[in-house]
C-alpha cells in the first residue's frame, strides 16, 4: 500500500538539460500539510519551447536546514508552433492497483513506453478505480490513498517522474461507473470527486478542454467527457449531451 504522508518542506530546481551555462531556477521551500495530502505542486512559467528540462526535488523536515531526500526527473516542453520536428507520443487508459500485471513493480506498459521514450504521454482516464475493492474508495481519504498507492509503484513512478504527461479523467477516477453530476458514491459527491481530480491531483488549464500544439504538424485535442454530461437516465433528445453546451460550441468553432 501507500506510505503515510508526513509534514515537511520541499522545493523544486529545474534547468535545461543541454544548456550547461543556463541558470538553474529554484522555487521557494513549500510546506506539505495534511490538507493537501502532504503533497506539493508548482506552476512553472517562462519555459523554453522544444526543450528537455532536468528536475531536482529536494525535501527536508519542517524547520530544518538539512536536505534529507532528493528525487531527480525531467520533462519535455512542446516545440514552438512553427517548428517542424519529429516526435513520438504514447497513449494509455484504464488501469488500477489490484490489476497490475507485473506484481508490485506496477504495469508492464511503463517499461515498454520507457524504451520508446516518447515526447509526451496522454493518459485518457480511469487511472484508478474508486469503485473496485481493496479498498472501495467511499471517502475522499480512501480516494487519496488509492492515488498515492498507484503512483508509488516503482515502474509507474519511474516513468512519470521523467516524462511530460497529460491526464484526462473518466468515470471510475471521478466517482464511480457511468457517473454524472449530482450523484454520490459513499460519502463523496460527484462535485467533490471532480474537485479532487481537477484541482488537487491533476490541475491544468481552465477550462480543461483545450487544444495543444506540438510544433507545426501536430495539434492534440483534449475533451472533458464527465463534468458537463447529462444523466444517462435522461430521455434521448437534442438536449441530452456528453460535452455540455459551452464545450460543444467551442468544439464546433
Model-derived features with residue positions:
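Metal-dependent phosphoester/phosphodiester hydrolase catalytic core
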Residues: 1-253
Amino acid at each position: 500500500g501507500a506510505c503515510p504522508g508526513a509534514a515537511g518542506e520541499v522545493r523544486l530546481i529545474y534547468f535545461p538539460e543541454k544548456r550547461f551555462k543556463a541558470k538553474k531556477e529554484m522555487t521557494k521551500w513549500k510546506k506539505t500539510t495534511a490538507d493537501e495530502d502532504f503533497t506539493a505542486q508548482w506552476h512553472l512559467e517562462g519555459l523554453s519551447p522544444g526543450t528537455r528540462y532536468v528536475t531536482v526535488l529536494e525535501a527536508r523536515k519542517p524547520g530544518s536546514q538539512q536536505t534529507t531526500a532528493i528525487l531527480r526527473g525531467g520533462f519535455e516542453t512542446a516545440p514552438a508552433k512553427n517548428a517542424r520536428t519529429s516526435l513520438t507520443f504514447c497513449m494509455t487508459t484504464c488501469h488500477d492497483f489490484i490489476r497490475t500485471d507485473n506484481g508490485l513493480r506496477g504495469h508492464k506498459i511503463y517499461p515498454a513506453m520507457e524504451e520508446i521514450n516518447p515526447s509526451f504521454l496522454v493518459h485518457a482516464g480511469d487511472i484508478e478505480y474508486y469503485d473496485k475493492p481493496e479498498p472501495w474508495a467511499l471517502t475522499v481519504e480512501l480516494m487519496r490513498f488509492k492515488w498515492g498507492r498507484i503512483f508509488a509503484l516503482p515502474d509507474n513512478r519511474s516513468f512519470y517522474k521523467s516524462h511530460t504527461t497529460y491526464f484526462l479523467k473518466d468515470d471510475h477516477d471521478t466517482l464511480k461507473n457511468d457517473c454524472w453530476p449530482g450523484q454520490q458514491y459513499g460519502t463523496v459527491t460527484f462535485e467533490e470527486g471532480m474537485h479532487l481530480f481537477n484541482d488537487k491531483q491533476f490541475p491544468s488549464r481552465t477550462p480543461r478542454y483545450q487544444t495543444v500544439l506540438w510544433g507545426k504538424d501536430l495539434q492534440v485535442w483534449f475533451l472533458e467527457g464527465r463534468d458537463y454530461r447529462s444523466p444517462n437516465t435522461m430521455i434521448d433528445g437534442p438536449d441530452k449531451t456528453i460535452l455540455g453546451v459551452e464545450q460543444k460550441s467551442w468544439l464546433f468553432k
